[in-house]
């Protein structure tokens, strides 16, 4: 506020803002909106949905102290335990060694290494990208995480705050590979999933302060800004209209769709969907003007780039993410959010508005082409519902081709629905554990942000991550968001960021005794 008041623009606009605020405070519009907000709050407080979200289930309560959780945590932490014993036996030698102190200083900054790694991963252009980069990077971060616990007696790689469902999904991934109908086609996809597992375990286990959370959000916002500016530059340079991306009869006059560093406009839009809520959360929780500016500018440019992707499923997902964010943050702002949405609709370019109108138009070639995909996936699941085809879209595509189940005009690539695709790959238990894991994360996040004692930075991190995950799950109803492994990694990075915030919130309430939440 002091920065605004001391600026020339602030001195000019602040009196106008204060005058408008005073007039609005006692206006009829303000009373109507406050009444709507209060009625909404009362309705939500007693709703079945709110009770479901805020109630902690029996499995969730039992997981942390269960024998299975303890055994898995012990097995995963064996290398760290051995290093701790080595440090205890040679403590004096390590403490007196300059080289050892330098190594400890490096490995204990694992969250910073993850932040830099994710920044690089998200901004490498598609033609230079190789999925081996992310696997090698997170394998190195995992080794750093293991070594970082050498001097911390109680440090363990954390599975308790991953929850039973995500752990079960990870187990199903490992099982789905040997049980695959086409193991050779599933091998490389196993590495993609293992990369995501390493990402989640490393972030949840090593983030110990709100400053580390803020740093991860800052680097994510910076990556969002870079890729969004690349998309805007692409639009300025000119993008050729690709008929395979759009129905030219229903979208006349629509320009080419931008894709930035991700080859496909839908893929780029899905990345924006995951990162925009995180950037907004970073803006709202930053303590300095530079962080607030980065969060605001990256989110604003990201929204402009999102419009230029013309990706309808991601638009719907972003709208849903905005609703989730506002409801969790301050339900009284819902009427203002509705007004803001109406204003945005009124000023949208004609091409964007016309694109929105085609969302439920079944004559659209993109929409119409999905029905044969869904039908083929449904028929396959009738034949192999429990085990699925095996990891990866290649195995599913091969299985459906061998059974001659797809009868569309084009060829079968994937199911264009994340729930069907995960079911076809990992079987019934896999899809249940996946959906259960994301809902478990969302529920734990809702419970954490509802506590009055929750740290503001931790709270906003959870809000941004939970909103992004829910929006992406809605987007996944019409698209397979993990078609590109890099997007799958970003999805699990946001999930890990949310879980890390939940862990810090629980630690603050005394549910876990370890390092402090703040520094």
Where does each model-flagged region fall?
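Alpha-helical transmembrane segments of multi-pass inner-membrane proteins
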Residues: 120, 171-175, 198, 214-254, ...
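A membrane-periplasm/extracellular boundary helix in multi-pass inner-membrane enzymes
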Residues: 229, 235-238, 326-365, 375-383, ...
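Long extracytoplasmic/lumenal interhelical loops at the membrane interface
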Residues: 245, 360-375, 387-426, 448-452
């Amino acid at each position: 506020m002091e920065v605004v008041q001391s600026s020339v623009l602030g001195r000019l606009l602040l009196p106008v803002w204060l005058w408008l605020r005073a007039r609005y405070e006692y206006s009829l519009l303000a009373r109507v909106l406050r009444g709507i907000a209060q009625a909404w709050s009362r309705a939500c407080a007693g709703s079945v949905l709110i009770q479901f979200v805020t109630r902690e289930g029996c499995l969730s309560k039992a997981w942390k102290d269960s024998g299975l959780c303890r055994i898995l945590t012990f097995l995963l932490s064996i290398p760290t335990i051995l290093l701790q014993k080595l440090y205890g036996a040679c403590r004096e030698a390590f403490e007196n060694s300059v080289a050892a102190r330098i190594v400890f200083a490096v490995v204990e900054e694992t969250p910073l290494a993850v932040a830099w790694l994710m920044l690089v991963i998200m901004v490498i252009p598609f033609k230079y990208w190789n999925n081996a980069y992310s696997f090698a990077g997170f394998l190195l971060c995992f080794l750093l995480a293991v070594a970082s616990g050498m001097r911390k007696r109680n440090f363990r790689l954390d599975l308790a705050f991953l929850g039973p469902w995500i752990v079960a999904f990870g187990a199903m991934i490992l099982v789905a590979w040997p049980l695959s109908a086409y193991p050779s086609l599933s091998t490389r996809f196993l590495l993609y999933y293992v990369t995501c597992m390493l990402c989640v375990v490393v972030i949840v286990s090593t983030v110990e302060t709100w400053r580390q959370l803020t740093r991860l959000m800052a680097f994510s916002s910076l990556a969002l800004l870079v890729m969004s500016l690349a998309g805007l530059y692409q639009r300025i340079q000119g993008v050729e209209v690709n008929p395979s991306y759009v129905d030219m009869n229903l979208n006349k006059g629509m320009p080419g769709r931008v894709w930035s560093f991700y080859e496909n406009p839908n893929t780029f839009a899905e990345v924006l969907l995951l990162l925009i809520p995180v950037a907004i959360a970073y803006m709202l929780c930053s303590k300095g003007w530079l962080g607030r500016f980065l969060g605001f500018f990256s989110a604003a440019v990201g929204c402009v780039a999102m419009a230029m992707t013309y990706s309808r499923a991601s638009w719907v997902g972003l709208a849903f993410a905005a609703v989730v964010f506002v409801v969790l943050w301050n339900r009284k702002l819902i009427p203002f959010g509705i007004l803001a949405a109406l204003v945005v609709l009124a000023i949208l370019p004609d091409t964007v508005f016309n694109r929105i109108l085609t969302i439920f138009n079944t004559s659209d070639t993109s929409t119409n082409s999905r029905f044969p995909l869904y039908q083929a996936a449904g028929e396959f699941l009738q034949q192999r519902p429990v085990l699925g085809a095996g990891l990866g879209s290649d195995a599913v595509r091969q299985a459906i081709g061998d059974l001659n189940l797809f009868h569309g005009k084009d060829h079968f690539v994937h199911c264009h629905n994340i729930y069907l695709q995960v079911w076809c790959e990992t079987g019934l238990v896999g899809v249940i554990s996946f959906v259960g894991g994301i809902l478990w994360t969302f529920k734990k996040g809702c419970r954490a942000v509802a506590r009055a004692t929750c740290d503001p930075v931790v709270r906003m991190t959870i809000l941004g991550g939970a909103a992004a995950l829910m929006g992406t799950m809605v987007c996944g109803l019409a698209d397979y968001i993990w078609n590109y492994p890099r997007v799958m990694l970003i999805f699990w990075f946001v999930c890990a960021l949310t879980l890390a915030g939940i862990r810090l919130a629980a630690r603050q309430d005394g549910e876990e005794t370890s390092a402090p939440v703040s520094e």
